[in-house]
């Protein structure tokens, strides 16, 4: 691959007892057509075969760091950022993986006016007997990026991001507070958007995101999301605040709905139907009707 400028990219991969996934993630980095990279695996002292998996890759560009992160994945990512020697940091979760052109397809667009790349991912839903696939689609954010990210919600997947290390240093890395677990990435994008609008969307599916039942994806994210966005709310006007509030309420309602806890979600959904963006309004109406039918006909699932 003939890329005129090929600065070093540091791939930061936090992991904990994901030996059964980690090999796939590392192989996808090894397969990159853009070859000037280093991969830093930050392991929270796993008790599985993580060490053997990393050691099976003899490429000197792959290194292993051990830390105690006390259940806070942000601490692992921060350790990787500190250790990174690259101009660019690329985040990759250990259960996700990239297509071989991912780094090239992003970095061929690099110039002084781009600070942050992101793209679409294929979502692989792990189910008892099969995988279902759909696209985790993103879009080009409108300027000011910060406002669009707040009002539209987090449309940026962690394993799609490549960002300048210097900017992560400028915002003092990722927030490690317990309250924000699961939404620390969203908070990071918001804080980066405070200092740069140079977010570049690559409209291609360049990797895979694994959604599995044991993951953070199953938790009620509305509380962590509130922590992630609270300090930015004063920047919004009244209409924008209502949209953000409806996002929080929809997130809470959706979790309750998936857990079949229908009693408390009607008020949340009514608010969403009044104030949310069109897509959330439609989802809320659908959910509201589903709840109504389930309670009317006594179906518990």
State where each predicted segment sits.
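Acidic helix N-cap motif at the loop->helix transition within catalytic regions
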Residues: 20-23, 48-56, 97, 101
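N-proximal low-complexity "stem/linker" segments adjacent to membrane-targeting elements
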Residues: 1-30
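Glycine-rich, basic loop-to-helix element that forms the pyrophosphate-binding segment
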Residues: 67-84, 105
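Short aromatic/hydrophobic "clamp" motif used to bind/position activated sugar donors
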Residues: 89
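Conserved nucleotide-sugar donor-binding catalytic segment
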Residues: 140-220
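Catalytic core of nucleotide-sugar-dependent glycosyltransferases
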Residues: 205-213, 217-243, 264-274
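A conserved acidic beta->alpha catalytic loop
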Residues: 28, 35, 43-52, 69, ...
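Conserved donor NDP-sugar-binding/catalytic core segment of glycosyltransferases
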Residues: 101-132
């Amino acid at each position: 691959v003939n890329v005129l400028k090929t600065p070093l990219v540091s791939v930061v991969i936090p992991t904990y007892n994901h030996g059964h996934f980690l090999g796939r993630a590392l192989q996808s980095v090894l397969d990159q057509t853009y070859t000037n990279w280093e991969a830093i695996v930050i392991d929270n002292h796993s008790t599985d075969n993580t060490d053997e998996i990393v050691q099976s890759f003899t490429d000197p560009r792959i290194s292993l760091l051990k830390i105690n992160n006390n259940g806070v994945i942000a601490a692992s990512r921060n350790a990787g950022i500190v250790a990174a020697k690259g101009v660019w940091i690329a985040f990759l979760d250990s259960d996700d993986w990239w297509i071989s052109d991912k780094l090239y397809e992003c970095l061929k667009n690099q110039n002084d006016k781009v600070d942050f790349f992101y793209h679409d991912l294929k979502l692989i839903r792990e189910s008892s007997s099969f995988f279902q696939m759909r696209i985790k689609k993103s879009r080009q954010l409108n300027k000011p990026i910060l406002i669009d990210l707040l009002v539209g919600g987090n449309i940026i997947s962690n394993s799609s991001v490549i960002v300048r290390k210097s900017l992560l240093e400028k915002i003092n890395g990722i927030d490690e507070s317990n309250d924000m677990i699961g939404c620390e990435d969203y908070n990071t994008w918001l804080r980066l958007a405070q200092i740069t609008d140079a977010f570049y969307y690559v409209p291609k599916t360049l990797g895979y995101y694994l959604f599995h039942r044991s993951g953070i994806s199953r938790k009620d994210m509305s509380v962590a999301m509130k922590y992630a966005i609270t300090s930015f709310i004063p920047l919004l006007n009244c209409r924008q605040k209502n949209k953000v509030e409806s996002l929080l309420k929809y997130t809470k309602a959706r979790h309750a709905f998936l857990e079949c806890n229908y009693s408390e979600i009607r008020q949340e959904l009514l608010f969403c139907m009044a104030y949310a963006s069109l897509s959330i309004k439609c989802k809320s109406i659908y959910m509201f009707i589903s709840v109504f039918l389930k309670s009317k006909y006594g179906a518990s699932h």
